[in-house]
């Protein structure tokens, strides 16, 4: 999918990510990936930079929206169409691959992964306190 749409804030981060080959991006450092998903309404590819962690071969992302009362739009897009393209930092620069998004439904597993992500981005713990919703955790599983 070739991305055709991003917010101005996201575009700045995307441009920086490409210029730095995924390293030292903004305040997030080396933990930013670019996920391209189809818009649920438009069907157009939309690229979103996201903080990520790893769990084995899987990439963990968190639908925090800064602790807002609603989920980010990209989560709705994934629920509509879970097949995505991912660009991520790798040992040899960056890598691109296709993945499937899996919502973590098991509460204990979600809590384990969320705790792992707060070690990478401590603000997630604050975001969780700001909202009444359970912040969703998503695994991006590489398609083979």
Residues covered by each model-derived region:
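Short, structured beta-strand-loop surface elements
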Residues: 65-124, 130-134, 142-144
């Amino acid at each position: 999918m070739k991305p055709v749409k991003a917010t101005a804030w996201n575009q700045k981060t995307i441009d920086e990510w490409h210029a730095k080959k995924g390293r030292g991006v903004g305040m997030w450092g080396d933990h930013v990936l670019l996920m391209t998903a189809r818009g649920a309404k438009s069907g157009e590819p939309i690229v979103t930079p996201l903080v990520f962690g790893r769990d084995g071969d899987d990439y963990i992302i968190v639908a925090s929206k800064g602790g807002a009362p609603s989920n980010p739009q990209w989560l709705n897009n994934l629920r509509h169409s879970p097949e995505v393209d991912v660009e991520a930092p790798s040992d040899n620069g960056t890598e691109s691959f296709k993945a499937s998004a899996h919502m973590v439904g098991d509460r204990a597993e979600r809590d384990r992964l969320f705790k792992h992500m707060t070690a990478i981005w401590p603000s997630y713990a604050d975001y969780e306190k700001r909202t009444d919703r359970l912040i969703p955790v998503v695994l991006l599983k590489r398609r083979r």
